[in-house]
């Protein structure tokens, strides 16, 4: 519709956001296994009686302690069972959105009978790997997902191979929207946000709608660690100021509370993560309301936030030892700074200060405590913006921060890609020892 007005680079930016910013019901690592199980079950005519599943260490890490929506249970086995018995394989990250109460009961019964086994895939060279093999009588079907939460690479049944993905991913990556985005810069992203027609990016307002609803639910209910609602009570007790900084903290953490606590509402995700989507969205929403921004300004700020978050995260492994709420909050810092003064220098300084502040935060698996890290990252983003508005930032003379924001980002991502690989192994070992 907008091709005549939008150059190819901008089209790639829009497509990158449409690929990476999607609704997702439930934490995306268990959901990836649920999708594999649902897709496998769809290949069978009979009722699924048994499930064997294999996942990568990183997916195991992020699936051990998180609640699966609608079940009140945590972990990968219930996700696999519910995916097979009540999932919609065509719904992607919303695979469990229509799961019935009967499907939940049947899934719990399957677990109780010991008919679901989830194991580590060994050896495994893939950071994100999930495979589900489901059985019905003498028939079976097996689906493998690799690299991305919904990227099905192989479907096989007892009758033979149904589907296998062509092995040209590296060549396609260079020309994909994400590949194009990764070779641009924050300055080019800002130029796009300032000039793109509003109608071409209006869709990003859905992020505010979905994640705003999660935030409201988090404040209403007692989800997860209920950080948001607890801090709201402290405001009423006079222990926290009722100001913009506190509103950012409370509303962002409340959305993550609901998300990780198993609320049956979808999050608008970013880079395959609901918490990253929440972090890139809610702080920007709160500041937009504070400054009286209309829908167009909100959409531009959200587009800057989400695109910046994707741009940074694409330089990282899909899953790693680095808590990616921090990189999503760098996007939020860009969006909030843009709403207040719109200058590139302010945005760059805010991101540099973020890298100097929260870059060491580890990911120790998806759980209710993610809301703590989301709230910390959101608060750090606002602090960095406030500093940048006064032309103050962590400089290239300090730590891993460079004199150029692009190099600062590269320095951060090199830590996650290299040095933190051993950290990741140690985290997984510690978590595995707790499980026994």
Swiss-Prot record:
Family, similarity comment: Belongs to the UPF0597 family.
Pfam family of the protein (one): SDH_alpha
InterPro entries to which the protein is assigned, alphabetical: Ser_deHydtase-like_asu, UPF0597
Protein encoded by which gene: yhaM
Intrachain disulfide bonds: none
Gene Ontology biological-process entries: L-cysteine catabolic process to pyruvate
GO molecular function annotation: L-cysteine desulfhydrase activity
Entry protein name: UPF0597 protein YhaM
